[in-house]
């Protein structure tokens, strides 16, 4: 399995990290699916974990139903079939904040403010979806 690192280089993924990479990518696909179905969604964190992955997302007053979850899963399958390239890029702080503000990612902007020592931030883009990765 190949992996794209934050600096853009591609290399073989160490076997002991493969599951983590798959889960991290799945979190991005899920977030992209949610954003397509709920454009107002504001994402906080979405890490891979030891047992899977999750994403904290603010949907305002929207409460997800079982049907909504099934629709998110269908959209995830659709995104996977699109075989979108994953493109890493790094931005200096000011540009990173501007990008997240333009995309209405308020929790990401807030998180960047908490990381005062960071001068640049890593992002991954797949199709129309862009996610910040710390």
Where are these regions (language model features)?
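TRNA-recognition modules of translation machinery and tRNA-sensing kinases, especially anticodon-binding
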Residues: 25
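Auxiliary tRNA-acceptor-end handling modules of aminoacyl-tRNA synthetases
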Residues: 1-22, 30-33, 42-48, 54-134
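Metal-associated gating/positioning segment near the N- to mid-region
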Residues: 36
């Amino acid at each position: 399995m190949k992996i794209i690192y934050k600096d853009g280089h591609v290399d073989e993924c160490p076997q002991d990290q493969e599951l983590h990479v798959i889960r991290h990518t799945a979190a991005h696909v899920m977030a992209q699916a949610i954003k397509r179905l709920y454009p107002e969604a504001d994402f906080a964190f979405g890490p891979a974990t030891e047992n899977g992955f999750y994403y904290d997302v603010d949907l305002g007053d929207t409460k997800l139903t079982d049907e909504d979850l099934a629709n998110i899963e269908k959209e995830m399958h659709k995104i996977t079939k699109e075989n979108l390239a994953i493109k890493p890029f790094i931005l200096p702080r000011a540009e990173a904040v501007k990008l997240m503000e333009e995309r209405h990612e308020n929790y990401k902007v807030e998180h960047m403010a908490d990381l005062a020592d960071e001068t640049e931030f890593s992002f991954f883009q797949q199709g129309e979806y862009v996610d910040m990765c710390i």
